């Protein structure tokens, strides 16, 4: 029999409950009020009293209301049908909720995440008599553009033998597709779907690898200077309006991955609506089908209950780990982890815990670290390799990178793409600061070359600061030329037009080709009689390079521009 209790205190979305029986941490419960059952999660246990965070508005809950515990942790349902879906933080399908409730979501309405009526064409890849363990494949169904493997549920801890398996055909997620038997002779029925707790990492693999293979985003500044590896982690901190969301959307469109999961936790609803409108219309260059076919969106906007923000982050990473177990490459984009941290701060305050810096909980760093640590590249039991790459945007107030959430994130991620107000105000997009950002991963271009090129940016910035004080006349022609070359590199290689059909996505071959052209210009010595002549010449080179960026790779226009560029360089270079 499930544990019962009654409400003895309400503070915002924190409810204190007196229980009769045993309760465990993170257990799901329902508060019965006004004819509705409101979902909540246990976050503290003290004797016969527990504190629970309610995932809904707590208006109307009063002392004495009955509470029923489920004896289950907060879980997600895993199975075919997750892709193309839009869920809230508790994995309720929002399109179905809209049909049931209309424009405004009602409290206490929870729907099944997966469609129980849809038939999936199952093709078996194992047979009766095979020995299996948790995570092994029984067969697959085609879901969008991926082979969705049907696996032995991850909570099965023993070794089993298949005693029954259905023939190829159409089945729903609740129909039995196999029966397995353990060593004691007990039989277990297997369907296409099962549940898994969101806060427990999925570890049914042989070993973890160190991320080394670059995950191409087709954004030049990232792939060349601040690369991200498959199975790695990165963060995009930046002030409001610096282009975090656009950069994440461009990355999700063009990244070299099989599946993209977008966790919109606490961001404005308008940005999510933009994604929902654009993604079905965008064509995936790898498959020629809609981008939505390989995307799952977990949407918990700023207008939804605060407590579900934390759940949305964990729901997203659990779905990502599930698809990783099929040998696929997953990209998870969390926008924004600051809102999740603010939700933690709110709950910590209500629990009357000792606050840390800026009133965030003292355990903020360990919680953020435990989330990013669930990224990784792994070797599965059958030898396949799957990865989850996690990118979180951070929204520090006023673009201050010294605040606790940014600092806690920087300690655990492998790449830092810092957006600055200075670059976004100058309309230099993507507004990633080439001086403050860094990456621990290997990129598509030789590191010796990139270090040499970055040195130009550093020198150019120093000369620019000097010019602000003494003016152009106060510096030598050689220094002015270094400054002009750094500006050429910035405008022609670091900046990219996300709304141009050609420049929005640049593959590694083109990146290498264009980088070599810019690299050779930087290494070439030029001599000019005065600064005006130098500026005119570099501006001419810059315009040629910008026109090349907007031309199809190696077509007649591109080749003509390249020929003109090389003639200009050869004419002015000092031998």
From Swiss-Prot:
Pfam families given in the database record: ATP-synt_ab, ATP-synt_ab_N, ATP-synt_ab_Xtn, ATP-synt_VA_C
Gene Ontology biological process terms from the UniProt entry: proton motive force-driven plasma membrane ATP synthesis
CDD domains (UniProt xref): ATP-synt_F1_V1_A1_AB_FliI_N (cd01426), ATP-synt_V_A-type_alpha_C (cd18111), V_A-ATPase_A (cd01134)
Catalysed reactions, as listed in the record: ATP + H2O + 4 H(+)(in) = ADP + phosphate + 5 H(+)(out)
An example Gene Ontology CC term for this record: proton-transporting ATP synthase complex
Keyword terms of this UniProt record: ATP synthesis, ATP-binding, Hydrogen ion transport, Ion transport, Nucleotide-binding, Translocase, Transport
The UniProt record lists the keyword Amino-acid biosynthesis: no
Molecular-function GO terms, alphabetical: ATP binding; proton-transporting ATP synthase activity, rotational mechanism; proton-transporting ATPase activity, rotational mechanism
UniProt EC number: 7.1.2.2
Keyword ATP-binding included in the entry's annotation: yes
Family named by the database record: Belongs to the ATPase alpha/beta chains family.
Biological function: Produces ATP from ADP in the presence of a proton gradient across the membrane. The V-type alpha chain is a catalytic subunit.
Xref: NCBIfam families: PRK04192.1
Name of the molecule in the record: V-type ATP synthase alpha chain
Organism: Borreliella afzelii (strain PKo) (Borrelia afzelii)
Gene encoding the protein: atpA
């Amino acid at each position: 029999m499930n544990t019962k209790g009654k409400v003895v205190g309400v503070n915002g979305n924190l409810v204190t409950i007196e229980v009769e029986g045993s309760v465990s941490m993170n257990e799901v419960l329902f508060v019965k009020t006004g004819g509705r059952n409101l979902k909540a999660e246990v976050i503290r246990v003290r004797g016969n009293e527990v504190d629970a965070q309610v995932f809904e508005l707590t208006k109307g809950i009063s002392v004495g209301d009955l509470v029923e515990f489920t004896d289950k942790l907060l879980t997600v349902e895993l199975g075919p049908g997750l892709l193309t879906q839009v869920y809230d933080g508790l994995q309720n399908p929002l399109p179905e909720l809209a049909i049931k409730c209309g424009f405004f979501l009602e409290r206490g309405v929870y729907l099944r995440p997966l469609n129980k009526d849809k038939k999936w064409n199952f093709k078996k890849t194992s047979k009766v008599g095979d020995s299996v363990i948790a995570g092994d494949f029984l067969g697959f169904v085609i879901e969008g553009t991926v082979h969705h493997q049907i696996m032995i549920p991850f909570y099965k801890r023993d070794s089993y033998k298949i005693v029954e398996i259905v023939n190829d055909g159409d089945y729903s997620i609740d129909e039995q597709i196999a029966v397995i038997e353990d060593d004691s002779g007990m039989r277990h029925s297997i369907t296409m779907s099962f549940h898994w707790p969101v806060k427990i990492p999925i570890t049914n693999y042989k070993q973890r690898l160190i991320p080394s293979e670059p995950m191409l985003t087709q954004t030049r500044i990232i792939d060349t200077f601040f690369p991200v590896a498959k199975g790695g982690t990165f963060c995009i901190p930046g002030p409001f309006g610096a282009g975090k969301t656009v950069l994440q959307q461009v990355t999700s469109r063009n990244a070299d991955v099989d599946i993209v999961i977008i966790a919109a936790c606490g961001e404005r609803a308008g940005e999510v609506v933009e994604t929902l409108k654009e993604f079905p219309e965008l064509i995936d260059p790898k498959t020629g089908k809609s981008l939505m076919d390989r995307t799952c969106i977990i949407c918990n906007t700023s207008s939804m209950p605060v407590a579900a923000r934390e759940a949305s982050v964990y729901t997203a990473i659990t779905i990502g780990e599930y698809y990783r177990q099929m040998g696929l490459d997953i990209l998870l984009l969390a926008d924004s982890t600051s809102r999740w941290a603010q939700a933690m701060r709110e709950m910590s305050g209500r629990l009357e815990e000792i606050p840390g810096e800026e009133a965030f909980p003292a355990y903020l760093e360990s919680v953020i670290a435990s989330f990013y640590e669930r990224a990784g590249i792994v070797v599965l039991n059958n030898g396949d390799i799957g990865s989850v790459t996690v990118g979180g945007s951070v929204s520090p107030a006023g673009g201050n990178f010294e605040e606790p959430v940014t600092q806690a994130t920087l300690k655990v991620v492998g790449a830092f793409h810092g957006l600055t107000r200075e670059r976004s105000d100058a309309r230099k997009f993507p507004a990633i600061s080439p001086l403050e950002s860094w990456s621990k991963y290997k990129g598509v271009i030789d590191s010796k070359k990139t270090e040499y090129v970055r040195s130009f940016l550093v020198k150019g910035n120093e000369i620019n600061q000097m010019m602000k004080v003494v003016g152009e006349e106060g510096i030598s022609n050689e220094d002015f030329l270094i400054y002009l070359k750094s500006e050429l590199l910035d405008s022609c290689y670091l900046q990219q037009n996300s709304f141009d059909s050609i420049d929005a996505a640049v593959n590694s071959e083109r990146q290498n080709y264009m980088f070599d052209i810019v690299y050779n210009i930087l290494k070439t010595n030029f001599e000019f009689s005065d600064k005006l002549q130098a500026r005119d010449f570099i501006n001419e080179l810059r315009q040629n390079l910008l026109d090349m960026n907007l031309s199809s790779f190696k077509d007649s226009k591109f080749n003509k521009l390249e020929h003109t560029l090389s003639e200009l360089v050869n004419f002015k270079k000092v031998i």
